[in-house]
Amino acid sequence: MDASTLFKKVKVKRVLGSLEQQIDDITTDSRTAREGSIFVASVGYTVDSHKFCQSVADQGCKLVVVNKEQSLPANVTQVVVPDTLRVASILAHTLFDYPSHQLVTFGVTGTNGKTSIATMIHLIQRKLQKNSAYLGTNGFQINETKTKGANTTPETVSLTKKIKEAVDAGAESMTLEVSSHGLVLGRLRGVEFDVAIFSNLTQDHLDFHGTMEAYGHAKSLLFSQLGEDLSKEKYVVLNNDDSFSEYLRTVTPYEVFSYGIDEEAQFMAENIQESLQGVSFDFVTPFGTYPVKSPYVGKFNISNIMAAMIAVWSKGTSLETIIKAVENLEPVEGRLEVLDPSLPIDLIIDYAHTADGMNKLIDAVQPFVKQKLIFLVGMAGERDLTKTPEMGRVACRADYVIFTPDNPANDDPKMLTAELAKGATHQNYIEFDDRAEGIKHAIDIAEPGDTVVLASKGREPYQIMPGHIKVPHRDDLIGLEAAYKKFGGGPVGQ
């Protein structure tokens, strides 16, 4: 596309050089800038990428978007604008022909449950033989092909490219986990959502948002982003068991479908039966009551299942067809995931990293604990510490508790575990400043019949250490290695 055409939608401040050049890519990553691409510089929290403008010029890039004039060779065109990342959204969506308009786009937001609901929607679509894409905490996936990602919601240009990649691969729908950070930072500008889903709102990320009011407002931006064009068929799916849903009803003109277990809703679950092999319930809908069986464990996952089913149903698939698909869904990685059922202990990993998420996790597993419940939880560094003692209190619902850091970054690991211990309600706990050692200890003290829960990370494949260096780490692999060493078994008979 000719750059002059591309920039017609942008009210630029100043252009230094010529826009008569062909553009086939846009990037905010200086390492990928080249001839034919636009490099968009920005001022981030830790890095001002304007300092890389000379580097991208050396790589052959002839067009940069900046917030102030840079000292660059005359053959490099500079487009000066007040808000470079806002302009990046406009340019990316225009250059790649508005990819989110070319498929059905589901957006899932909430403190807990985003990954589960988004993954369930993707898996249901696959069971229905539909080409589907997923983007979120567990990476980027088109049908069964997976790649890892760095953020739940990538920056705006990367996100647009992922949607374009899904479209080019023939995806009929794409499900996005929508983080509050991504909404506030404008990473989702220009994405055309068709269905917006809300799971819940509990305390988290106050280190970024400051107050619960600001955090709630951030979540509401997804529903505002649906727009006001009632000629389009768009829908909202809200959890009536969370009172914040009432506010979200007020920020969108589109039809709302509510679900709930404890509070009255259009879609409800009754006659719930739970086990470590899954759940069953009666799905009470405006069109009748349907028996549902699911391989997902825990009452909270019933809420997630309902949200996913309603979202897919809203776009035209019958409930009967969806319910049949739900019975045979694969596990959501790292979400109440039981590792190797052949072990004499129940070894479970989960992503729960808030007091509310941990409460629901313990509620789900406690009825099936045969002997002791051993619970390991971590606190992340450089995060809101006001939630930490409450996490420690909830963890002490277990018989034995292990406090560890989780992505300590530049914080003192001992300080993080001490903050968790402030909430302890019994003395049956221990602190480890090395999470891997804490996991090994959990297995070491476990006896046949015990349940060991490793919370806070799921299958996250790293620990963020001082200097924000990512060090390889997998709770599941460390736990399984220790369990096979103690109890025997394993894929190679350790």
Curated annotation (Swiss-Prot):
Gene3D superfamilies named among the record's database cross-references: Mur ligase, C-terminal domain, Mur-like, catalytic domain, MurE/MurF, N-terminal domain
GO CC annotation terms, alphabetical: cytoplasm
Residues that coordinate or bind ATP: 110-116
Motif (L-lysine recognition motif): 406-409
Binding-site residues, UDP-N-acetyl-alpha-D-muramoyl-L-alanyl-D-glutamate: 30, 152-153, 179, 187
GO terms for biological process, alphabetical: cell division; cell wall organization; peptidoglycan biosynthetic process; regulation of cell shape
Record PTM text: Carboxylation is probably crucial for Mg(2+) binding and, consequently, for the gamma-phosphate positioning of ATP.
SUPFAM superfamilies, per the entry: MurD-like peptide ligases, catalytic domain, MurD-like peptide ligases, peptide-binding domain, MurE/MurF N-terminal domain
EC number in record: 6.3.2.7
Keyword hit for Ligase: yes
Positions carrying N6-carboxylysine: 219
Keyword Hydrolase part of the UniProt annotation: no
Pfam families, per database record: Mur_ligase_C, Mur_ligase_M
Known pathway: Cell wall biogenesis; peptidoglycan biosynthesis
Alphabetized UniProt keyword annotations: ATP-binding, Cell cycle, Cell division, Cell shape, Cell wall biogenesis/degradation, Cytoplasm, Ligase, Nucleotide-binding, Peptidoglycan synthesis
Reactions the enzyme catalyzes: UDP-N-acetyl-alpha-D-muramoyl-L-alanyl-D-glutamate + L-lysine + ATP = UDP-N-acetyl-alpha-D-muramoyl-L-alanyl-gamma-D-glutamyl-L-lysine + ADP + phosphate + H(+)
Protein location: Cytoplasm
InterPro entries associated with the record: Mur-like_cat_sf, Mur_ligase_C, Mur_ligase_C_dom_sf, Mur_ligase_cen, MurE/MurF_N, UDP-N-AcMur-Glu-dNH2Pim_ligase
A GO term for molecular function: ATP binding
Main location group: cytoplasm
The protein's role, per its UniProt record: Catalyzes the addition of L-lysine to the nucleotide precursor UDP-N-acetylmuramoyl-L-alanyl-D-glutamate (UMAG) in the biosynthesis of bacterial cell-wall peptidoglycan.
Protein known as: UDP-N-acetylmuramoyl-L-alanyl-D-glutamate--L-lysine ligase
Gene name tied to this protein: murE
